[in-house]
């Protein structure tokens, strides 16, 4: 099944809800970055959370999320847009612990760390950016997105993200949900939401069992008839890197740096952090870039 995200209203229009299956997308990220179990889970959760923030944006806006904890994984970066395109990378892809956490799951908190920051940069178009930053509160990532939304954007939310990793490090299931309270929600509605959230199985297990974004939202809303589906968006791993972009980056290094690439290295190889694609520049190509540099 192809990955997709569903946006809907629930609880008499008092909550905005999102759910997504991201299994194929996270499989692609795992393959490109050769991530081990804990790194895969952390990257997949971050990418899925970022996907939800991207889905909240207007058409030409973009979101970049960076989670910098004090764990061995190092910084995790993901970006997404309103079209369901997502990419991401983790600084140390090879983190695996043989011991599971107290809940019998991969110990993502230990990998990410419990001290650090979650920062979000919104590219609003027209060269205008908005940056929000909150401390990491758990290192489990879903709770960290929840805290960011409540603190930085004043939106009471619940974010659940999960990745099920096979013993051979391949991805079995990935996805998540996000629920946001809208102004006017009554205490009764809040109580009902809390009851449904408590009864909800873990996201990765639901997806492994074949649940769809629609069926996850139905569980979240307390029934299919209580949902008003607004939009369905295809989700995929997409990177917009290109040789031209890397050429511009090389030009920005300045003439001296480019001259040293030509004379000492006799060429250059650039690698994209997000997708691991590489771009080779010959001496001749570097000479052309040298002419354009200041």
Swiss-Prot record:
GO terms for cellular component: cytoplasm. GO terms for biological process: protein refolding. Keywords: Chaperone, Cytoplasm, Disulfide bond, Redox-active center, Zinc. CDD domains: Hsp33 (cd00498). GO terms for molecular function: protein folding chaperone; unfolded protein binding. It is found in: Cytoplasm. Redox regulated molecular chaperone. Protects both thermally unfolding and oxidatively damaged proteins from irreversible aggregation. Plays an important role in the bacterial defense system toward oxidative stress. PANTHER family: 33 KDA CHAPERONIN. This is 33 kDa chaperonin. It comes from Listeria monocytogenes serotype 4a (strain HCC23). The gene is hslO.
């Amino acid at each position: 099944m192809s990955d997709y995200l569903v946006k809907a209203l629930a609880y008499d229009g008092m909550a905005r809800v999102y759910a997504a299956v991201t299994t194929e997308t996270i499989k692609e990220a795992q393959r490109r970055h050769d991530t081990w179990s804990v790194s895969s889970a952390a990257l997949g959760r971050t990418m899925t959370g970022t996907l939800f923030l991207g889905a909240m944006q207007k058409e030409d806006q973009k979101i970049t999320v960076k989670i910098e904890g004090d764990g061995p994984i190092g910084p995790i970066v993901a970006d997404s847009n309103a079209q369901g395109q997502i990419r991401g990378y983790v600084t140390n892809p090879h983190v695996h612990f043989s011991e599971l956490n107290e809940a019998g799951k991969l110990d993502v908190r230990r990998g990410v760390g419990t001290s650090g920051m979650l920062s979000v940069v919104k590219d609003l178009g027209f060269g205008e950016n908005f940056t929000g930053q909150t401390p990491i509160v758990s290192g489990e990532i879903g709770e960290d997105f929840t805290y960011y939304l409540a603190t930085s954007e004043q939106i009471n939310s619940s974010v659940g993200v999960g990745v099920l990793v096979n013993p051979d490090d391949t991805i079995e299931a990935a996805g998540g949900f996000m629920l946001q309270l809208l102004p006017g929600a009554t205490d009764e509605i809040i109580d009902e939401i809390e009851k449904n959230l408590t009864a909800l199985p873990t996201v990765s297990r639901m997806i492994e069992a074949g649940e769809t974004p629609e069926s996850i939202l139905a569980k979240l809303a307390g029934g299919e008839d209580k949902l008003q589906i607004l939009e369905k968006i295809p989700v995929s791993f997409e990177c917009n890197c290109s040789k031209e972009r890397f050429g511009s980056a090389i030009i920005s290094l300045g003439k001296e740096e480019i001259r040293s690439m030509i004379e000492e290295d006799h060429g250059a190889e650039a690698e994209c952090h997000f997708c691991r694609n590489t771009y080779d520049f010959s001496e001749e190509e570097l000479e052309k870039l040298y002419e354009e540099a200041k």
